[in-house]
Amino acid sequence: MPNWCSTAYVIEGDTQEVKALYELMKGLEEQEKPTVENGFGTAWLGCLVDALGGDWHDVRCRGHWDGLDFDGYVLTFWTETAWATCNEVFELVRQKFPSLCYYYRAEEPGMGDYYTNDIEGRYYPERYLIDLSTDKGDWHTEYFEDRTSLYEWLEEIAGVPVRSEQDVQSLEERWEEINPDAYININEFKVFED
């Protein structure tokens, strides 16, 4: 069984090309049966590869998309894929629709991989993700652009000063004394240029 990678995408470019891609993906979703037999359904990335004229055997496409939305300018959706992003699919999209570019933010918590290609933070400015369970068992997951705002938020949750990684570790230790299931995970998104 793989670790699953959740990836949020934004695709922008020439409006007609964005719309054409949206209509292609929406049409695939609405099929009664997938165009290529698979275990993911009609929104399998391999169906998109096939519709673009590619061979799904040659392109990493182990997963599906969901949450498809077109606001008239940009296309947004997310994917759930095995182990990592399936950006090869979107490189194929770019071959068919040359004006398009894609931005993504990927999270694969099983291996602690968090990354984005949104260098300027145009769509995904957050560089940190905190996931925690307090001493009272309250769960929180939040995104932050910088450590300062993360620490300020954590300070509000905890009711004690938090200004450094050492403060976070001390807080986690105090919470664990009260509730052994308490934890604080801070994940930093690596920024890659595709």
Task: Name each model feature, range by range.
Residues 1-194:
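Intrinsic low-complexity, intrinsically disordered or marginally ordered coil/linker segments
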